[in-house]
A protein has these predicted regions:
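Positively charged, low-complexity nucleic-acid-binding target-recognition regions
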Residues: 81-183
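Substrate-contacting helices/loops that form the catalytic groove of nucleic-acid
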Residues: 1-91, 165-183
Length: 183
């Protein structure tokens, strides 16, 4: 985000320059240099993350997301954050690195009710469609489920079902906001 702020500052300076002047082109080079640095920073992080995942896991399950809807103003109001993640680039990097190492990237359909299904008793509860509900208790088995962790477990289980895997899979554990702990 620091580079984004610097970019905004330099773009404001550029907008004040007279188009076609020597100072305009000097400022344009500065703006382009920051764009280039941001792109390289993002690519470097994604390459390091996907290499780590591909080296440590044979099967990775992800949910296909409606990124266009998430980025739209009427959607989830995550616009800049969704674009900063470069999810499509991430999945393509991860897929080719897993293929090179003999692994598999399994994509679970976005309409699969991952956050609405209890991972313990597999009953579906549409009340959890509301995104503000972060934890919920299953009325059937009385298990308290964290929305994200429960969804991650359901995506893992669905991917295992799609692949025909019955043996347990080592779960991905990432630090911070970059992932969900799924056991």
């Amino acid at each position: 985000r620091k580079k984004q702020e610097k970019l905004a500052k330099e773009q404001r300076k550029l907008s004040r320059c007279k188009k076609g002047s020597k100072n305009y082109f000097k400022q344009l080079r500065k703006v382009n240099k920051i764009h280039y640095a941001i792109t390289n920073q993002r690519k470097d992080y994604l390459h390091k993350l996907t290499t780590y995942l591909a080296n440590n896991y044979n099967v990775i399950a992800i949910e296909t997301l409606n990124l266009k809807g998430m980025a739209s103003k009427d959607g989830f109001k995550l616009g800049k954050s969704v674009h900063d993640v470069a999810f499509s680039y991430f999945t393509s990097l991860l897929e080719y690195k897993l293929n090179d190492r003999g692994g598999k990237l399994e994509k679970v359909d976005r309409f699969f009710p991952s956050s609405q299904t209890c991972n313990h008793c597999h009953n579906k509860f549409p009340i959890t469609k509301d995104l503000s509900v972060r934890q919920w208790e299953c009325p059937n088995c009385h298990t308290i489920n964290d929305r994200d962790a429960n969804a991650a477990k359901n995506i893992r289980d669905e991917a295992m079902r799609l692949l025909g895997i019955t043996a347990p899979i080592k779960a991905v554990e990432l630090e911070g906001n970059s992932g969900i702990v799924c056991r």
